[in-house]
Swiss-Prot record:
It comes from Chloroflexus aurantiacus (strain ATCC 29366 / DSM 635 / J-10-fl). This is Holo-[acyl-carrier-protein] synthase. InterPro entries: 4-PPantetheinyl_Trfase_dom, 4-PPantetheinyl_Trfase_dom_sf, ACPS, Ppantetheine-prot_Trfase_dom. The gene is acpS. GO terms for cellular component: cytoplasm. Keywords: Cytoplasm, Fatty acid biosynthesis, Fatty acid metabolism, Lipid biosynthesis, Lipid metabolism, Magnesium, Metal-binding, Transferase. Its EC number is 2.7.8.7. Belongs to the P-Pant transferase superfamily. AcpS family. The keyword Chloroplast does not apply. It is an enzyme of class 2 (transferase).
């Protein structure tokens, strides 16, 4: 069985959150590895990279059937949730994005019988897009 999630994010939304909340927002949403990868650049490229990873986290949550309401502080009360750090976008040896799951996100993937995940990221200066395909079986 295949599961799919897709998300589109306005880069300006992420830029606004970073400018308004600073490191508090960045540390709450992104792992140390993601921060190092995204913030290594300069200028608006940093916001584009952060937005693409936000989109990947949300697309993955959708593929897992938990959606945005199952992530972080936005989770519905009395329902299990995944923390933002539990869906991590890292790079493989060739620089391609790869998803790494932990905690409830990993448990949900196991419950669905997911054996592989693929993520694709794309962004412009205005929009970031992520698509996640999960294979079960």
């Amino acid at each position: 069985m295949l599961y799919h999630g897709v998300d589109l994010v306005e880069v300006a939304r992420i830029r606004h959150a970073v400018v308004r909340y600073g490191q508090r927002f960045v540390q709450r949403v992104y792992t140390a590895t993601e921060q190092a990868d995204c913030l290594a650049g300069s200028g608006d490229v940093r916001y584009e990279a952060l937005a693409a990873r936000w989109a990947a986290k949300e697309a993955c949550a959708k593929a897992l059937g938990i959606g945005l309401r199952g992530l972080g502080a936005l989770a519905v009360a009395d329902r299990p949730r995944a923390g933002f750090h539990e869906i991590e976008v890292v790079r493989d040896n060739d620089g391609r994005p790869v998803l790494r799951l932990s905690g409830f996100a990993a448990e949900q993937a196991a419950a669905l019988g997911i054996c592989a995940l693929a993520v694709s990221l794309s962004h412009t200066d205005e929009l970031a897009l992520a698509s996640v395909v999960a294979w079960a079986g």
